[in-house]
Structures are given as C-alpha cells and as structure tokens.
Amino acid sequence: MAQETGSVLEDLRSRLSGDTVNDIGRRIGADPAQTKQAIDAALPMLLAALGQEAADPQRSAGLKQAIREDHDGSVVDNLGEYLSGQMSGRATNGEGIVNHVLGDRREPAVQALSSKSGLDFGAIASLLPLLAPIVMGMLGKKERSGGLSLDSITDALGQDTRRAADEQPDLGDLLGSVLGGSGSGEGGIGDMLGSIFGRR
C-alpha cells in the first residue's frame, strides 16, 4: 500500500491521475482532459463542504465517526476495483455521502462544476458520487497512518481549499456561490472560507 505523505488534496491528486482519470472518464462519458479539469474543481468543492461540516459542532462528531468506522482507505488502495464496481458497502456509498455533505446545495454544485469544466450536468452528477468515497477513504487512510488528526481536520481541509483557490483564481467564486461566503471578491478567499468554516 502506498504511503500518503502530502496534504489531503496533494495525495488525492497523486492518486487521481493517469489511467485512473481515464477510467473515471469512461464511467462518466467524458474525455480525459475534461475529466481532469472537472476533478481538479470537484475535489476542493468536496473538501470545502467536508470542512464546513467538520466546523459545525452539531455535525462534526458524525463526520469523524463515519471516517473512523466506515472509511479505512481500502477504496483508495483499490481504485481499479472500486471504479469497476467490484466493491460495495458503506465506504462506497457515494450518493449517500454527497447527499449528506451537500444536501440541497448538490444541484447548484453540479451546475457550477459543469460550467467550469465544460462537462454536461449528467457527467458531473455522476462524477461527484464517484469521487466522494475516494475523498472519504483518503481521510480515513491518513487518519489511520497518523498523517491526519481528526481533531484538526477543519484546519487541514481549509488549508487545502485555500491552496486550490490560489491555483485556480475563479475557484473561490465557484465555492462561494455554492457553499456561501464572499468568493474571491471583496474580502477574498480567506473571508469566504472563514464564512464556510465558521470563522469570523
């Protein structure tokens, strides 16, 4: 099993490259270049939404419990098997994860990611549930290996989201429009994430 030594986002990007992008593209009916662009925007969206949940005192305990009990990293370590539909169980319930984390923001998230990547609504709607178990699996894998403390998960996810927004100048607006906050306009990405993660 590969050892993850970077940030959550860095390690996800490392895993979601090359042939894996091609496999995901085939699943959602998109070419590799557009699939990669969509993944690069969708990962920060999911991480920011999870960070928002982790910052909510009423929801953080449930998120941490799910990571500890349902996501041991097996999805990450067996991506080929997972993407070919050979795995089952709570760890692979992408629809459930996306519905729980995004709730009524799911459709706006799909619309925003579709506009950014150029993929149609249906492709993005299929992509998010494919990625969600991989993201949760990475959190569980890093927690078990000592590379992530769930007590500081909000900070870790916030740092990753800021890094992604710095790399993609329009991503702050996309996240802000879907998850709340000021985007990259007045106040900038820091204020947007402060709103998302409950910091004033």
Predicted regions span which residues?
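A structural "flexibility-hinge" signal
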Residues: M1-R200
